[in-house]
Amino acid sequence: MRVLSEIIKDYSDVKVRLISGNADEMETALQHGSIDFAVLMANRSLDNYHHLQIPESDRWGLVMRKDDSLANKAEISPEDLADLPLLMSEQAIEEHRFQSWWGNLDRKMNIIGTYSLVFNAQLMVAQGSAYLVTFDHLINNANNSQLTFRPLAPALTETTNVIWKKNVTQSKAAQLFIKRLMASLDTYA
C-alpha cells in the first residue's frame, strides 16, 4: 500500500479501484481483465503470471474475545482448537491448508462455518459465538477492540505475491506501479 500511496501523491490523475476477495476471485478478475494486479496470500502455482513475492509472510492464528481464557496463552496449539466453534477461511478449507497442521485431531475440529472475507466473521467472534482462524493484521484488535489475535504454533505461514497477467500491455500507471514495487522490494534485499 505504501507504493500505491506514493504514486497517488505524486500523480494526482492516477485513480485506483481496490477490490477485496479470495485468491480464486482475484485470479478470475485478473483473467477477465477487470483488474491489473492481484495480491494473493496463498501457496499456489504462479506459472501463468508475472509475480513479485513480498518479503513478509502472513501468519495464521486465532481471533477471540479478549476476555476468553485462551487469550492468556501466547500461542494456540491444535489441541486448543479441538471442539471450539471455528470459522475458517473458505479458501483454506478448499485447499486443505490445515490438514497436516492439526493432524489426527481433524475429527475434533468443529468448523461451524466459513468466510471469504474476514469482516463479518469477526462480528460473530465479538458476540462470543465463534472463534476465527485467520491471518494476523486482518482484524482491528487495537486497545479499544474486544478482540485479540494469538498465533498458531507450530507456526503456519503463507507467502504474499503481487501478480499480473503475462503478455498484456500495461498502462503507464501500471508500469509505474511495477517499477516502484520492484524498487521497494530491492531495499529489502
Each language-model region and where it sits:
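Central regulatory/effector-binding core of bacterial HTH transcription factors
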Residues: 1-46, 115
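Ligand-binding cleft/hinge of the Venus flytrap
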Residues: 3-12, 80, 95-109
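Extended ligand-binding regions for polar small-molecule ligands
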Residues: 5, 79, 159, 163-189
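Short loop/turn segments at beta->alpha junctions
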Residues: 22, 77, 116-117, 135
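Beta-alpha-beta core module
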Residues: 47-53, 57-59, 120-167
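Flexible hinge/capping segments at coil-to-helix
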Residues: 49-60, 64-86
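Short helix-loop capping/hinge motifs at secondary-structure junctions, enriched
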Residues: 67-77, 154-156, 167-173
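Secondary-structure junction motif
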Residues: 84-106, 170-174, 178, 188
